[in-house]
A protein has these predicted regions:
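SAM-dependent nucleic-acid methyltransferase catalytic core
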Residues: 1-17, 24, 69-194
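Conserved, well-structured beta-alpha core segment at the onset of a catalytic domain
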Residues: 4, 17, 22-26, 42-49
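Hydrophobic alpha-helical segments that mediate membrane insertion or helix-helix packing
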Residues: 32-35, 184-185, 207
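Short, glycine/acidic-enriched loop or turn micro-motifs at the edges of active sites
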Residues: 34, 59, 170, 186, ...
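Single conserved hydrophobic/aromatic residue that forms the stacking wall/gate
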Residues: 206-214
Length: 214
């Protein structure tokens, strides 16, 4: 189990190498930019008894993780039904377009926004979010019954996570054995996060000041 999502810049393949650099003693794990969660999931498996505090500024993604932790059965039930009602690429395209409209609807429950986010993530090119377009191939291979079935196991795994939607600096600590992992968005040509990439731009400007400014 690596991650329930397809996420740009995700570290699922790099996790084994990253873990080679872990300190000998860790009493708490914190992650400022959760994203696809590969590193936090690995740390939970390696250190099942330590506190895990993860943070995500992008609201739809934060709500997905929150719903996965607290309402995994609901996500599973809704997504299974939607997949069964939209088995072909034509109907999946309309499901994707509807989900894109729902991801940022404040009037919806956080659970239904999480359902919408998962659909957009799984049915788009490269796991992009609201700035993405529909991928027929992804709607078959990634928005799958098998992937939805796995959500229950992920829900159990992260049941003790503390999940927040805060400024990344809130997770900083002076305690020597608190391990903070920070992997902010990359500066790339494509806008990856949020509506038309606005979240991606904001994150870059906010979290990546020039060394000359320090």
């Amino acid at each position: 189990m690596k991650t329930p999502l397809r996420y740009p810049g995700g570290k699922s393949r790099a996790v084994p190498k990253l873990c080679q650099w872990l300190p000998a003693e860790i009493t708490e794990y914190r992650e400022s930019f959760l994203g696809g969660g590969s590193m936090a999931i690995e740390m939970t498996k390696r250190y099942p008894d330590i506190p895990i505090w993860v943070n995500e500024l992008y609201k739809p993604l934060y709500l997905f993780w929150l719903a996965l932790r607290d309402d995994g059965d609901y996500l599973y039930d809704q997504l299974i039904q939607l997949k069964q009602r939209h088995p072909d690429q034509g109907s999946a395209r309309q499901l994707f377009l509807d989900a894109k409209e729902k991801v940022n609807e404040d009037d919806l429950s956080y659970k239904d926004r999480a359902v919408a986010f998962y659909i957009v993530n799984k049915c788009s090119f490269s796991g992009l979010t609201e700035s993405s377009s529909f991928s027929p191939q992804a709607s078959d291979s990634n928005f799958s019954i098998r992937g939805i079935n796995n959500l229950k196991e992920y829900s159990k795994l992260i049941k003790n996570w503390k999940i927040t939607n805060l400024d990344y600096r809130e997770l900083q600590s002076d305690e020597s054995n608190v391990f903070l992992y920070a992997d902010p968005p990359y500066q790339v040509k494509d806008n990856l996060y949020g509506h038309k990439g606005q979240m991606h731009k904001g994150c870059l400007l906010y979290t990546s000041p020039s060394p000359r400014d320090s």
